[in-house]
């Protein structure tokens, strides 16, 4: 590995898990080959996907290339940005963020630094594929939850390489996908799985229930609240949309308030 990566790994206050190391070696091999990497990294929340992404970006930086990390929401983008800045604070890598709410003056500076090559890593949302976003030397594109981005959106990002050569692609997902299904959905991607949690991390349980068991779910939430915990209910839509039959926050909030009346429950809404 490049000295930047070796130095960084030695500076970490923890060791990578066996699964992280295995996946990192696969990525490192891809980046060191003559072919363009196209790899999917799958792992539960907290399994350490971001660290693998940071190592990949650091390797690209050491070779003189820029990295962009595109997330589907501003909240997730800022979370990635905060973590990456924390990890790389002593490396000299300039990390920037660009979202739809970035103020004009700040946006102008971010775009200038990106085009001049001063920015090594940029994190953002769909704002990264706008026409005025120009890279100096994009070498690695990391996409979190690729299924939330359309084909055209992704291809617009690829076209931002000045020399016309597509960047290496690293896709991250926390969605549990059986390998056979992954081959169908992401047939063009090699698949790596981080199937081990760092020491001290509790495993994440993913449970799917049907609509008819919603009352059982509400009772489970009441039990968790009684135990001193909190519950977050996430909706794919904010308002009712006649074009798609998705649950929405507007009507869902009313339903939740009815199921969890005040007092003793306190229900808040944010979007």
Language-model segments: which ranges?
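Upstream accessory/linker segments immediately N-terminal to the RecA-like ATPase cores of bacterial MutS
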Residues: 1-12
């Amino acid at each position: 590995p490049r000295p930047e990566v070796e130095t960084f790994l030695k500076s970490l206050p923890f060791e990578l898990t066996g699964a992280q190391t295995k996946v990192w070696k696969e990525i490192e091999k891809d980046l060191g080959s003559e072919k363009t990497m196209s790899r999917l990294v799958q792992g539960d929340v907290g399994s350490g996907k971001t660290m693998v992404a940071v190592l990949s970006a650091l390797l690209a930086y050491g070779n003189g290339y820029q990295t962009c990390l595109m997330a589907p929401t501003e909240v997730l983008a800022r979370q990635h940005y905060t973590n990456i800045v924390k990890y790389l604070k002593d490396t000299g890598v300039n990390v920037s963020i660009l979202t739809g709410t970035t103020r004009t003056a700040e946006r102008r500076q971010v775009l200038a630094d990106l085009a001049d090559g001063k920015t090594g890593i940029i994190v953002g949302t769909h704002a990264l594929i706008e026409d005025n976003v120009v890279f100096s030397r994009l070498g690695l594109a990391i996409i979190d939850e690729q299924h939330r981005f359309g084909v055209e959106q992704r291809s617009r990002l690829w076209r931002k390489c000045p020399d016309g050569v597509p960047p290496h692609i690293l896709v991250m997902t926390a969605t549990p996908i059986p390998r056979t299904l992954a081959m169908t959905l992401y047939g063009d991607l090699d698949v790596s799985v981080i199937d081990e949690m760092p020491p001290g991390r509790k495993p994440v349980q993913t449970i799917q229930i049907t609509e008819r068991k919603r009352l059982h779910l509400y009772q489970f939430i009441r039990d968790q609240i009684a135990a001193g915990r909190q519950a977050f209910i996430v909706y794919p839509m904010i308002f009712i949309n006649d074009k798609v039959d998705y649950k929405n926050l507007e009507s869902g909030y009313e339903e939740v308030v009815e199921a969890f009346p005040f007092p003793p429950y306190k229900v808040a809404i944010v979007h």
